[in-house]
Amino acid sequence: GSNRMPVHPDLIDLAKNGDTDAVKLMMKWGYEGSKKFIGGNPVEKIIQSPRDIREILAVDLIACNNYTNGSNAARLIDCPSLLIFGSLDKMVNLESGKKFSSLIKNSTTHIIEGCGHMIMIEKAFEMRDKVLEFLK
């Protein structure tokens, strides 16, 4: 589940039009804003064409922007849950993440320092270790 994740209308418009700037802007905000990728941007390797941007990224951004039931859904979660946030995330700021975590019964929150929104790309080993620790 997720809480409300508003997306700037200009970013949605770029994605709907298949503009490659949509991917670049999303990654600038999502990946700690300044790091360079070894071997190139992984999202640009997945979303390669204007059609991909329209059919994958735009649909995802619109879904994030329009979803409004996160708080209600979170209150219904009734199993141990781990929420991992990046301290530098500009897409889901830390305060919003903590508020969302507080809605889930029996939840554990872990903050990965020096990490943005793309936790699995930025800090894969730390994330993996925290998930394994939680599952034990």
Predicted segments, located by residue:
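Flexible "cap/lid" loop of the alpha/beta hydrolase fold
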Residues: 1-20
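Alpha-helical elements of Rossmann-like donor-binding domains used by nucleotide-donor carbohydrate transfer enzymes
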Residues: 10, 25, 44-45, 59-63, ...
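Conserved alpha/beta-hydrolase catalytic His-Asp/Glu region
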Residues: 14-76
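Glycosyltransferase donor-binding loop in the core domain
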Residues: 15, 89-92, 116-119
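Residue-level signal for the nucleotide or nucleotide-sugar donor/cofactor binding architecture
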Residues: 52, 92-95, 122
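Short beta-strand/loop motif that positions the catalytic acidic residue
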Residues: 77, 83-85, 89
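Short alpha-helix in the alpha/beta-hydrolase fold that links the catalytic acid
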Residues: 79, 93-102
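Catalytic active-site module of serine/aspartate enzymes centered on a nucleophile-bearing elbow/loop
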Residues: 107-136
